[in-house]
């Protein structure tokens, strides 16, 4: 089983990492190519391209200038400890043991506009480059063209080492990021967990809660060493319950009704 997550825009380089182990990202040469292109942009260009504030554009202009193809604990941090958004609050890697993180290293992957595909312990230098950014490059009009089938091929290398029910991809990424994966070329079926909360008289996806729940699901897989997708149906963290009637073989729906 491989579970894929989206990255986070919010980053934490202040909190010291609680583990020393780290690995190097697989697509450093590709990331370097993107950085070379990003370095040609002014802060004003970055603000317009990414629809971000001027201070944030200046911050990322400097990040691109500082970025190095040499990764060390002095200039980078393990990805799963550096990302700090809703998904990663749910995953809460800071409280996972080194043994848990070793398991995550084999079963969790993070999709990234700059780095392509990251393992949890891959070193990450600070950046901002969302997968949906229409950043024209030598390979095409946007990052989907840039990455092509590279991410899918990398996932297949991992999936092909699994067998039976364990050869499955669990999609806990956003639509924007999962578009970088080509399901028809994958060497495994895809299961997408969907998290809905009761609000206004019906069940609906509430972005903040759904993002957190994706992280909780990834943690559930890691802590319980899950390899069989049927075991995902037992997920019940923070009140979510698997709804068999709303689910099918490729979409697992979890619902929560609180306070009504």
UniProtKB/Swiss-Prot annotation:
Recorded coiled-coil stretches: none
Domain of life according to the entry: Bacteria
Transmembrane annotation, as ranges: none
Entry's Gene Ontology cellular component terms: cytosol
Cystine pairings recorded for this chain: none
InterPro entries cross-referenced by the UniProt entry: YaaA
Example GO BP: response to hydroperoxide
Recorded family membership: Belongs to the UPF0246 family.
Protein name: UPF0246 protein Bcenmc03_2247
UniProt source species: Burkholderia orbicola (strain MC0-3)
């Amino acid at each position: 089983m491989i579970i894929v997550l989206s990255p986070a825009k919010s980053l934490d380089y202040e909190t010291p990492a609680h583990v020393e182990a780290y690995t190097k990202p697989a697509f450093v040469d590709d990331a370097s190519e993107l950085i070379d292109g990003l370095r040609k942009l002014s802060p004003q260009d970055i603000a317009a391209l990414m629809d971000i504030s001027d201070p944030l554009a200046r911050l990322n202009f400097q990040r691109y200038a500082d970025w190095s193809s040499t990764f060390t604990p002095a200039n980078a941090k393990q990805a799963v400890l550096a990302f700090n958004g809703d998904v990663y609050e749910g995953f809460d890697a800071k409280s996972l043991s080194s043994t848990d993180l070793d398991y995550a290293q084999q079963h969790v992957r993070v999709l990234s506009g700059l780095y392509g595909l990251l393992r949890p312990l891959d070193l990450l230098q600070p950046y901002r480059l969302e997968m949906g950014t229409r950043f024209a490059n030598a390979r095409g009009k946007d990052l989907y063209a840039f990455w092509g089938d590279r991410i899918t091929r990398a996932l297949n290398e991992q999936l092909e080492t699994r067998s039976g029910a364990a050869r499955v991809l669990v999609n806990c990424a956003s639509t924007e990021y999962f578009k970088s994966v080509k399901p028809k070329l994958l060497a495994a079926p895809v299961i997408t967990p969907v998290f809905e909360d009761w609000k206004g008289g019906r069940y609906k996806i509430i972005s903040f809660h759904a993002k957190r729940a994706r992280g909780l699901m990834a943690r559930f897989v890691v802590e319980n060493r899950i390899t069989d997708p049927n075991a995902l149906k037992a997920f019940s963290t923070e009140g979510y319950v698997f709804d068999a009637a709303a689910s099918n073989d490729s979409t697992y729906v979890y619902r929560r009704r609180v306070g009504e």
